[in-house]
Amino acid sequence: MATTTATTPPSLTDIRALKYTSSTVSVASPAEIEAITKTWAETFKIPNDVLPLACWDLARAFADVGASSKSELTGDSAALAGVSRKQLAQAIKIHCTIRQFCMYFANIVWNIMLDTKTPPASWSKLGYKEESKFAGFDFFDGVNHPAALMPADGLIRGPSDAEILAHQTAKQVALHRDAKPTWHKRCQLC
């Protein structure tokens, strides 16, 4: 490596010597996902070959109701009868947030929805239009995220510009709506 100090301009060869792996606090790490599935296997006796299906099913269910600890899940995991999605979600909270878990599987959820032609359940209620309905889930930011798990065959298709814009707009509206009560209370004190 020709670069000898942090202030020496690096060559492209020097830069290529760095083997960087993307990580962020907004997406669960592979180690956190492994810890979650280990907890599930031990607690609920879920066979190893079913664990990926349980992850995908749970993340897909959160796409319908929102990826929050306050979200209400119903039913058993489609991967294993007798184990409720609610039980699986509780075990996630030991290792990371629900949103971080879902962000890790966003690309998988995206492909599931496109393949089954089934958008998130609340897309219309959230104000998404027909052409952007598949972006109507709150962890859509995980689609194409470098720290999210990518399907072996890639995405069925990437998000369209309309889907990206619709999600960004919905996100800003939600942030404004969530901030309004605080702003409103401050104004009442004036």
Curated annotation (Swiss-Prot):
Subcellular localization is given as: Virion
Q: Which residues form the signal peptide?
A: none
Q: Which GO terms describe its molecular function?
A: structural molecule activity
Q: What is its main location?
A: virion
Q: Which PROSITE patterns match?
A: POTEX_CARLAVIRUS_COAT (PS00418)
Cellular component, GO annotation: helical viral capsid; ribonucleoprotein complex
Q: Does the keyword Cytoplasm apply?
A: no
Keywords, in A-Z order: Capsid protein, Helical capsid protein, Ribonucleoprotein, Virion
Q: What is stated as this protein's family in its record? A: Belongs to the potexvirus capsid protein family.
Q: What does this protein do?
A: Required for genome encapsidation. Forms ribonucleoprotein complexes along with TGB1 helicase and viral RNA.
* Protein name as catalogued: Coat protein
Please tell me the species this chain comes from.
Answer: White clover mosaic virus (strain M)
